[in-house]
Every structure is written in C-alpha cells, then in structure tokens.
Amino acid sequence: MKRLPLLAVLPLLCASVASASSMMSVGYFNGGGDVTAGPGGDINKLDVRQITHLNYSFGLIYNGEKEETNVALKDPAMRHQIWLSPKVQSDLAQLPVLRKQNPNLKVLLSVGGWGARGFSGAAATPETRAVFIQSAQEIVKKYGLDGIDLDWEYPVNGAWGLVESQPADRDNFTLLLKELRQAFGKAKLVTIAVGANAESPKSWVDVKAIAPLLDYINLMTYDMAYGTQYFNANLYDSKAWPTVAAADKYSVDFVVNNYLAAGLKPQQMNLGIGFYGRVPKRSVEPGIDWSKPDAQKNPVTQPYFGEQEVALFRSLGIDLKKDTYVKYNDIVKTFLNDPQKRFTGHWDDDAKVPWLSVKSAEGKTLFALSYEDPRSVAIKADYIKKRGLAGAMFWEYGADDNNQLAKQLAESLAITP
C-alpha cells in the first residue's frame, strides 16, 4: 500500500471510531507480565459484557538491556520481537470462547506495561522496527486479534531511569507507530497508552504527529501521588486535603487539559480509571523534581507513617518497603470491611473521590489511601460525556470487586453488548 494515500485518509478513519459507536469502555486485563499488579488473572472468570474493547496484557519485548531480569527475554536471536509467556499464549487461544459473551467485543494485545524493557531498542532503527512490527503482525493474525496496543512507559523518560531510554525515543516512537499503521492498514486497531505526567505531551510523545496514526489514545489518568499522602486519581484539586509540593498538584482534569493543549482531539481520548489505590510510602518532598529522569533514585528521607502504622499495614499484607498497590477488591475486603474498623471513610467533594484515613499513635488523622468506588466512577463517566471524550479505559479487570466498577461504568456510559 502506498504511503501518501494511506496517511491522507487516516484522520478520517481514526475519527470515525468514536462516532460510529456511542462510547468506549476499554478494559485492561492483567493476564501476566505486569510487575506491580501481581500474577495474571483467570481469563475464564472474565465477564466482558460491560466493555467494548479488551486490552489483554501483556506481551513483552525480547531485549538486551542489562537490567532485564526475565531470562526468557534475553535470547539475542529473538531481539526486538514480542514475547508471550505460556500463560498468555494459552489465554489468547481461548479468545473465541470469550467472544461468545460479547460478539461485538474488540480484543487487542497490549505490549509493555510498567517496567517493561525493550521499547527504546525496538524503535531505534528501521531494521529493529521492522522486526517488531512483523512479530506484531504474526501474533495478531495467529490469535485473530483486532489490533495492537503499545504501553511504553515511557519514551525519553525511561520510567525515571528504570528502563533504557534516549532523547531520540520521541521521534522513534512516531516512526514506529507510522510504520505499524502502514503494516496493518485500516483493518486493525493501533492504540497506545500515555502517562499523566505533564512532560508526556510536551517532550515524551509527539501528540500532533502520532494522533492521526492512532484509532484512540488511552490516558493513564491515575498514579497522581507517586506513593505520597494524596489522591491516586482526583478529578479536580482538593481544598480540604491540599498537596504540599507544586510538582504533585495533579488532577485528572489537569492531565486531560494538557493533552488537549498538545493537540489531541477529545473524541480520540479515553479517560483512564484505576481500579486500585496506593498506600503512602513517604511524605511529599518538595525538593524532588519529578520531571528529571533520575528522580526515582532519590532516597526516601521522610517516611509518612510511624512504626505503629507500618506494623498495621504489614499485618494486612502490605509492605511499605515495596510497592503498595492495593486492588479495589482487596480495599473492600481488607479496609472497608475491616472487622476492627481501624479505617475511617471520607468523601472529598472537590477531588470527587473516596479516601480512607487511619489514626496515628498520637491520634492524628493520617491519609491511608484513596480509591475509586461506584460513585466516583459515575462522576468520571459524566465528566467524559461533558468533555466529549471517546470513552473510558480502566486498569484492570482483575482488581474489580464482582464487576462493581465495570458495571457502573457501562451503565453510566450507556454501553450494552
């Protein structure tokens, strides 16, 4: 297919995706591979009647990064191709059964995730991009997928030094997406997930260049607090519980406006909703500049909780020395239904999210975690409609509690299978 005719019609093709249906609800399912969400879930327990698109997560990339810990990804003969674990392969083979629940369901393979290595190398040259793209085409064809989703966290930034990156990533990502679209044409969906950080639409991804190449973009409008005592996904700023550092003054609305200012059209934008919370590991430290690539390497100098609270969380299975990601179903089970009632529930009417507090040894009210519930999800759905966005995305199916949040989202967006 010739390049110019394809690129000329792409804006029309991509814009039609959101308008052809009412709204989108893109559900990520952690089948395996994400380093924070834990082991992959059971695909046989999925109820996909509440969504329009399923992003199966994750495929990973064979790479030569020195920090790679997965031995299976180090095969030099497979470098830059997409790796699927045995479980992921088994799950993808079961998709025909899953589709019977929802014949209109679109299923994409999501490649990447937090801490996933290999993107910078795979996107670096025409040759490496060709290897990656051929691998993607083979997987999409083999499993009858509807497209591919790239979750590169993050070009240029490298997850604050966690994975390899380079300044050329921004342009190379554009080239990768351009060539990926050329390879798939209009027959398959090509989508990406992008971060909430203010630098993302400014210097990590070239929004104006990539938008015409994509069917839609999933905004990861969560993880606002970086593990500190603030909301994970506040819709707006809170007056009752203000941030300490200006660098942490993020909100969902702030992120949406940043991408709009960068040139992304609202009808190509899915608002991300996180079905989880994070317990604070440290106090906000105004001295840390999170726009710098090495920010993650800053030492933790001011723990938020005292010994009593640390011991409490440890007794609940949460180690504050590690990642403090807590799924919504565990929040319901462990925090909201705590028989000892050690946590107090709150609703912040500025931020439009619920949160929990715990008392310190001195009786001070401390921020335990924020999360989403049916009320906050419904409010975010209303925001999606008012702003004219394409729909919603959520991470992830296995974190929901009896499909409460997915069902609320579908109801609020008037999505039916």
Residue ranges and their predicted role:
Residues M1-S19:
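Gram-negative bacterial Sec-dependent N-terminal signal peptides
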Residues S21-V140, F305-G306, L312, I318-D323, ...:
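Glycan-recognition patch characteristic of GH18 chitinases/ENGases
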Residues G31-V35, F58-N63, G113-G118, G147, ...:
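Solvent-exposed loop/turn segments at secondary-structure junctions
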Residues L54, L109, L150, L180, ...:
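Conserved, mostly hydrophobic/aromatic
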Residues E65-P86, P155-K322:
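Substrate-binding surface in catalytic domains of secreted glycosidases
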